[in-house]
Swiss-Prot record:
It catalyses: RNA(n) + ATP = RNA(n)-3'-adenine ribonucleotide + diphosphate. It is an enzyme of class 2 (transferase). The keyword Magnesium applies. Polymerase that creates the 3' poly(A) tail of suc22 mRNA. This is Poly(A) RNA polymerase cid13. Gene3D superfamilies: 1.10.1410.10, Beta Polymerase, domain 2. Its cofactor is Mg(2+); Mn(2+).
Amino acid sequence: MDNANCVGGCKFETRSFQYRRRIPYSLGADPLPPVHPLSLKNLVDIDTDLISSQLYELYDSIILNDSGLERRYAFVQKLEQILKKEFPYKNIKTSLFGSTQSLLASNASDIDLCIITDPPQCAPTTCEVSAAFARNGLKKVVCISTAKVPIVKVWDSELQLSCDCNINKTISTLNTRLMRSYVLCDPRVRPLIVMIKYWAKRRCLNDAAEGGTLTSYTISCMVINFLQKRDPPILPSLQMLPHLQDSSTMTDGLDVSFFDDPDLVHGFGDKNEESLGILFVEFFRFFGYLFDYEHFVLSIRHGTFLSKRAKGWQFQLNNFLCVEEPFHTSRNLANTADEITMKGIQLEFRRVFRLLAYNCNVDDACSQFTFPSLTDTSFMDDYVNELQLEIVPGFSHGRDSSDTSCTESPPEPSHFAWAFDPYNATASPYYNQNINSSIDYSSIYSNDVPAIPPNVPYTFVDPYTYACYINNNSYLPPSYMDFYTWYNSPYPKSSHHFDERHGGDRHEKNLSNSRRYSRNKFHKKKQSSGPFQYYPDAFSFTPTDNNSPPSNSSSSEVVSPVSLHSEPVLSTVQAFKS
């Protein structure tokens, strides 16, 4: 039996929470249609100075003050004295972690406490700790021993504070140190994370245990990765900077080292002059409309995005949003939210962006969400209908009808070139770049492009896969069906559809697999038979020769709206016939 918990036979171990799913199942799991960035309101048309002033005013009113900090330390000392009295031979110490130590706590935040014993094997169980707290007059004692991290929840009626205690989970204190170091790197980090956490709490989106949403730590990691990906970046990756690595930096077999001198990193983001209001608005624009949830993982350890396929997370449960734990890199912090919940959260991101873009009112954006009574079944239906309005980026609701700065149709394509590179998603989606007007680009922007009949061979390059190829010379998709997809096709883009269109013949798919193995040199031995014979350079794609498809395939030219290099371009590339 695990020393940290005791399942069964404990009167404090109870399902005290009434599970209240935050996002209704009736919202459905259908993917949101893509939204052209040019259909969103431009940043220059948003009063970000007004938003900044509102954010700072609200931040000053909710941030943890000195008196609140003193009450927290008094509560921790009280708990430690109780534990030492109840377990005198356990060598118990306590360590604060979480938002209080990382400087991200508000006056309404809970206390997170780690109970440390020496040696760890002599630790009391969560049920024993719960009983000890109850015997000493603490209220609302709850033992949750079956969670991934068993905890004891307790409330002090005198100090009006609640605390979550775990036992010997010291890696949580290291996560707090890392978060605190990031907060001290730039003065904009702390208010931005605090205000986004405040929004999430007001909208009931930061309760993974009860509502099936996200944790506050996951949201903080999303903000840090967002700041690492700004252009120029505001935060570095502290784990990638040179620092001491030895046996002392290993905990439970994990490398928990990082560059922990924020004074030397202070000023890293000075070249980025974006205000708090701009960052607040752009955070919701990015995660509401621009981030590629299907293919990428947020990693603050690497300070960038990682491929789900490269990490092997494309088949994990609840992997719509993937946030890599900075130390335990095989763990997805966001797996507490399923696909329907993440669809609802993405629509909540869009709701905030709409209110900020057209009303510039932070109070409206952070309005309190209140769960209805169990008998009120119409409330959640109305809420789902409200969320579904965010799917269409027309923003006809909640703004002045005379405002024509943003329409459902993007600007005239002859004056703009849109290029979105998922590996460098920080650049503004607005490029005032003249492009060749002699080419008809209307099919890129039109919302009513007729479906391409199955017998027409023209295809469109998938931007994600093409960007992977351009940025990595060794990259080759698992099959050419991933590389070239039907643009605006009513048919599913899957290998099953591929086989059906070829009469169930898998010969061409096997050819694609053989090309992949050849390109990556997985099979060194020459194939003596079969539809494909091994030649090392038979399909040598290089970025300098991106107009040369494999010699045994016919091709046709299409327009690819992707960024090939540092400059956004809209160029013709070769595509295979399907």
